[in-house]
C-alpha cells in the first residue's frame, strides 16, 4: 500500500496537511475522511489502512486550525465552516483529478455541509457520531454562542465555554473518570486522546458557534432537499453518544433524509458505544458492517 503526504496551499494561501493511502488492488473508489473538532487526521491511520486493504483509496487532511505542523496561534480556530469545506473540495479535486471513481465521504457536520454545497460531486456519505438539531433545541444554542462570540471575541478560546460543552456531553456518564469520557467507553482510547497534544484542545468561540449553526442548518428539511437523492447514506452511531441524543437524534435525522427523497438511508446503531463509535471496543464488528455497506454500493 503506497502512501503520499504533502501540504496543499489553498485559495487564501493557507497550508493544508494531506495524506493519501492508495490501495494495492484495482480501486473501487475514493474515500475522504473528514476528522472532527479538536482532533486530526493521524488518528484515522488504522481505519485508512483497513479501507485501503478493502480496495479503496483514502484521502485525509487536517482542517484549518487543526493538525501537527501549524501555527499554534491558529490552533482551534476558523472563521467560517464554508471556507473549511472549500479547503476539502480543493483537496479532493487535487487528489481525485479526472479519475472516474466513486467519491465517498466519512465525517459529521462538515461532511453534511459539504454534500449540501457540492451535491453532484459526492457519490456516498457515511456519517459517524453526528446528531440532529431540531429548531427548539438548536436555535437557543446558536443564539447563546453567537452572543458569547460578540462579548469575548471570535478568536478567543474561553475555558469555561469549552468546559460547559464537555460537561453537557458527560452528564449521563457515571462514574466519570475524565472530561473526555463521552467520546468512548474504551478507557485506552480516552487516555490516548487526552495524551495527544494535537487533540482535545480548546476551540474558539467562532468555531463553536459555526459548528452549532451548521448542525442546525444541516438538520433542516429544506436544506437537506438539495442533496443528491441517489447518494446512499449510512449513519453510524452509538446508543450512548450524547451528540446523537442516545440514538434518538440519529433515527430522526435518518427519517428527515428519507422524507427529503434520499433513496438509500441506513442506520447502524450500537449498544454501549459512545461518540467515537469507529474507535470503540470491539470496533472490528463495526468496521465489518461498514465494509459490507461499502461493498453493496461500490464494486470494481
What residue spans do the PLM features occupy?
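N-terminal cap/lid segment of alpha/beta-hydrolase-fold proteins
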Residues: 1-25
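Conserved alpha/beta-hydrolase
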Residues: 43-72
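Alpha/beta-hydrolase active-site loop
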Residues: 77-96
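Catalytic active-site module of serine/aspartate enzymes centered on a nucleophile-bearing elbow/loop
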Residues: 258-300
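Active-site glycine-rich loops that stabilize anionic/oxyanionic intermediates
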Residues: 35-39, 239-240
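Short beta-strand element of the alpha/beta-hydrolase
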Residues: 28-36
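Alpha/beta-hydrolase-fold enzymes
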Residues: 111-198
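Short beta-strand/loop motif that positions the catalytic acidic residue
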Residues: 235-237
Amino acid at each position: 500500500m503506497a502512501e503520499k503526504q504533502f501540504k496543499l496551499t489553498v485559495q487564501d494561501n493557507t497550508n493544508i496537511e494531506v495524506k493519501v493511502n492508495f490501495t494495492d488492488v484495482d480501486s473501487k473508489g475514493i474515500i475522504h475522511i473528514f476528522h472532527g473538532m479538536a482532533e486530526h487526521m493521524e488518528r484515522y491511520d488504522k481505519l485508512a489502512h483497513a479501507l485501503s486493504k478493502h480496495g479503496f483509496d483514502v484521502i485525509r487532511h487536517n482542517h484549518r486550525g487543526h493538525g501537527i505542523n501549524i501555527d499554534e496561534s491558529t490552533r482551534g480556530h476558523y472563521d467560517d465552516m464554508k471556507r473549511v469545506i472549500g479547503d476539502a473540495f480543493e483537496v479532493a479535486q487535487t487528489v481525485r483529478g479526472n479519475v472516474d471513481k466513486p467519491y465517498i465521504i466519512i465525517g459529521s457536520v462538515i461532511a453534511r455541509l459539504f454534500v449540501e454545497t457540492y451535491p453532484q460531486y459526492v457519490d456516498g456519505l457515511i456519517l459517524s457520531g453526528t446528531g440532529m438539531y431540531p429548531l427548539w433545541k438548536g436555535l437557543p444554542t446558536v443564539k447563546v454562542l453567537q452572543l458569547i462570540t460578540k462579548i469575548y471575541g471570535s478568536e478567543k478560546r474561553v475555558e469555561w465555554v469549552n468546559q460547559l460543552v464537555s460537561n453537557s456531553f458527560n452528564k449521563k456518564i457515571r462514574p466519570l473518570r475524565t472530561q473526555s469520557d463521552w467520546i468512548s467507553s474504551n478507557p485506552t482510547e480516552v487516555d490516548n486522546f487526552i495524551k495527544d497534544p494535537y487533540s482535545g484542545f480548546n476551540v474558539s468561540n467562532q468555531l463553536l458557534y459555526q459548528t452549532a449553526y451548521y448542525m442546525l442548518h444541516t438538520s433542516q428539511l429544506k436544506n437537506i432537499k438539495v442533496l443528491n437523492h441517489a447518494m446512499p447514506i449510512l449513519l453510524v452511531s452509538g446508543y450512548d453518544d450524547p451528540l446523537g441524543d442516545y440514538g434518538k437524534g440519529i433515527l430522526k435525522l435518518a427519517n428527515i433524509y428519507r422524507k427529503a427523497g434520499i433513496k438509500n438511508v441506513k442506520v447502524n446503531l450500537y449498544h454501549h458505544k459512545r461518540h467515537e463509535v469507529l474507535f470503540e471496543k470491539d470496533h472490528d464488528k463495526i468496521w465489518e458492517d461498514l465494509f459490507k455497506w461499502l461493498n453493496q454500493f461500490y464494486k470494481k
